[in-house]
Amino acid sequence: MDINYLLNSGFMVQDEKILLVFDDYEDPAGIVDAAYDKGDFDRLYIFATHAHFDHFSTHVRSYAQKVTRYIFSSDIKHTKRVKVFPTSKITYMKRYSEWEDDAIKVWAYDSTDVGVCFRVELPSGKKVFHAGDFNWWHWEDDTPENIDLAEKAFKRQVKRLKGMEADVAFFPVDGRMGDSQEKGAIDFVARAEVKCLVAMHRVGYPIWTPSRDFLAIRRIPTWSPLKPGEHRTFDGVKFSED
């Protein structure tokens, strides 16, 4: 499985002839453009987990000719930006809904922010999970009441991911939260059966190195991309660079 980092929470995943693009709001390295022009895919699916500007952008409209399906969170349906997209190619998904065609199957899970998380099962049987903005958003300078609400909201939703399988999981490890940046990721890998974790939502912060607390829960390969255009291949056991 080939993985390219776009920016923020944006990634492109290719498995055999299936191309998945997640939360592509900017692509400074031109990764998706290059793949689109090369055309080495049979199916192209573009996902947006929610309507925040750093997850959903109209620039992915330019791929419409070859797109198999745009798969958007249902909150995007109510934005002005989505009106430029061909409605015949859009599927909107609410939390805990499913969608499939003859190539992939998609599950949508709830978030602790707006929108949804996606899990995609590919023809090869491999599974990809993208959390969107689902996380334990613990801000040290917030009020005790809000900190408590954030914890309860996360734990209520993460319980529903217990036993969920994914070969690759994209999950926020947001450097703005300092010592609390791993809280969500630790609880997530403790419950879900994931083979690796890719850190996201950390623009402007250095490479994340898993703490002992994280590794004590699940010793899995991790990747914390730093620069747009970085690439890794995941073989089910480890990441490898070009």
Each language-model region and where it sits:
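Active-site beta-strand termini and strand-to-loop segments that position acidic
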Residues: V13-E16, D101, V120-S124
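Active-site environment of divalent metal-dependent phosphoester hydrolases
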Residues: D27-A29, A51-F56, I76-R81, S97-W99, ...
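Active-site HxH/HxHxD metal-binding segment of metal-dependent hydrolases
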Residues: A34-E98
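Active-site-proximal loop/helix segments of hydrolase catalytic cores
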Residues: T112-A190
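Active-site-proximal beta-strand elements of phosphoester/diester hydrolases
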Residues: D2-Y5, L20-D23, I104-D110, K127-D133, ...
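Binuclear metal-ion centers of metallo-dependent hydrolases, dominated by the metallo-beta-lactamase
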Residues: N4-S9, R81-D102, Q181-D242
